[in-house]
Regions:
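Substrate-binding cleft of secreted/luminal carbohydrate-active enzymes
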Residues: 235, 249-263, 267-357
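Extracellular glycoside hydrolase catalytic/binding regions
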Residues: 179, 203, 213, 218, ...
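N-terminal catalytic cores of secreted or lumenal carbohydrate-active enzymes
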Residues: 26-174
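Active-site groove signature of glycoside hydrolases
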Residues: 79-86, 143-150, 186-208
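Phosphate-group recognition and catalysis centered on beta-loop-alpha active-site segments
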Residues: 26-28, 351-439
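Hydrophobic faces of well-ordered beta-strands that scaffold small-molecule active sites
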Residues: 78-79, 142-144, 198-202, 228-231, ...
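Aromatic-lined carbohydrate-recognition surfaces of secreted/lumenal glycan-active proteins
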Residues: 140-150, 163-179, 197-205, 221-239
Length: 439
């Protein structure tokens, strides 16, 4: 073999290796983004137009009480954010005619760390629930927002005796780093028993005004072993460049809930976009989701849950939850069973996402009736009420067990709509189940 042939063969091998490595790198970034915080609740707090966020108001966000009376832990992460002080000053663009200054930033800090409210109240609420239902197998994570340093602002104030001019990038970064340091210092001083500071949130929902700031701030945040997250609105400028912008995770906003004119197809498109761009997903609803609300958007919330299940978002994606000012609290207080029904459904999905299994000593009891699946030759047992089935990793849920034509035992975990999500399961386990009708 001559020298040219050897060279050509080596070049081809190198190219194939490069392509293989590049394809592998792409495959790693395919699919929904995952995160140590599985379910992140957005808490709008600080402005005078918000509720105080006392321990009682946090209760339905910390634990959920199901229809059968049992409680379980709900959200494992909480994002505290605010756009305006409610008195005329804004912490982000487009929310107020007047930009917040250092004075308002300090006021917002005081509100966040106020005793008996916000972080303090959340910590106490968790402590109270630990006494009632036991310690969770996770630590509640906290994400804190960073106000947007608005370009051109010159009246913000001083850092280390130097006036800040936000027409200069170095001053924008310096002021934000000061705020990060204040958040870190106060959180440490508070000595919360049940909260851990996970990272920070970029308040701007696009990069129209501050695109050059996220990378240097990301480096500073990472130097303290904290994470940096972002939730851009639907197809916001820069949403598809979130990694290049320095964020550890970005959540896709479908922005479907808010307008009845937006078709449900948006939810499918948002899920597919997130999976393509390796983003997490945000589930959105507000007080209009209550069944008895005027011009209720209840069905739009149901559509989110339906589509997120079908698109496997609940199964594999990190999730953020926008619930308006306090829609979860409103659902909790509602006297309409439909509101509790949809929250039971959502809470059951959240609990199951943690992969938590109940260790129960009681014997499995199943109420069932014999039915017939629409596939010819396949017998079916429809399990109408599974009380306890810790041996197969299910708890308090309903599902069907199918014996297919080729004697394969299958579980259907989808009882909420006409679609079916099938999983193979252990024949040995299922044959140990005793049905109350004697089968």
């Amino acid at each position: 073999m001559n020298y040219f042939s050897l060279y050509l063969k080596g070049l081809i091998c190198f190219c194939l290796l490069f392509i293989t490595m590049d394809s592998h790198a792409l495959s790693i970034d395919k699919g929904y983004r995952q995160n140590k915080i599985k379910d992140l609740a957005l808490i709008y707090q600080g402005g005078v137009h918000r509720i105080d966020w006392t321990s009682d108001q946090f209760l339905p966000y910390v634990v959920h009480q199901f229809a059968d009376g049992h409680k379980d832990w709900l959200f494992d992460g909480f994002l505290f954010l605010e756009f305006t002080d409610g008195k005329g000053c804004g912490f982000a663009t487009r929310y107020s005619d007047k930009n917040a200054r250092k004075k308002e930033w300090l006021w917002l800090l005081d509100r966040l760390f106020e005793d008996g409210k916000a972080l303090s109240a959340l910590d106490r609420c968790i402590g109270t629930q630990i006494k009632e239902i036991g310690k969770p197998d996770f630590t509640h994570q906290i994400v804190l927002c960073l106000p947007e340093v608005l370009p051109g602002q010159k009246d913000w104030g001083e850092v280390d005796g130097e006036p800040m001019d936000f027409s200069r990038q170095e001053d924008q970064v310096k002021a934000t780093r000061w705020y990060i340091d204040e958040l870190m210092k106060r959180f440490k001083q508070a000595k919360y028993k049940h909260l851990k500071l996970s990272g920070f949130y970029w308040l701007a929902e696009d990069v129209d005004f501050t695109k050059d700031l996220s990378v240097p701030l990301s480096k500073y945040i990472h130097s303290m072993n904290k994470t940096f997250c972002w939730i851009p609105y639907w197809q916001a400028k820069g949403y598809n460049q979130w990694k290049e912008l320095g964020f550890d995770i970005a959540y896709q906003q479908p922005n479907h809930f808010f307008k009845a004119s937006i078709p449900d197809k948006r939810l499918e498109e948002a899920c597919q976009s997130a999976a393509t761009l390796n983003m997490g997903m945000e589930l959105e609803f507000d007080e209009r989701a209550l069944f008895d609300a005027k011009d209720s958007f209840y069905n739009r919330l149901v559509a989110y849950i339906d589509h997120f299940e079908r698109q496997q978002a609940f199964r594999t994606s990190a999730m953020a939850y926008y619930s308006g000012n306090h829609a979860v609290l409103d659902m909790y207080k509602s006297t309409n069973p439909k509101d509790h029904e949809v929250m039971d459904r959502l809470a059951n999905l959240i609990v199951s996402r943690r992969g938590k299994q109940k260790k129960e000593s009681h014997q499995t009891k199943v109420i069932a009736h014999r039915g017939f699946w629409n596939t010819p030759g396949s017998a079916q047992n429809s399990l109408a009420a599974l009380v306890k089935a810790d041996s197969i990793g299910c708890y308090g849920s309903e599902f069907d067990v199918w014996l297919t034509a080729d004697d394969e035992l299958m579980l259907n975990h989808d009882g909420w709509h006409d679609g079916y999500s099938l999983e193979k399961t252990s024949s040995d386990v299922l044959r140990t189940l005793k049905l109350s009708n004697g089968e």
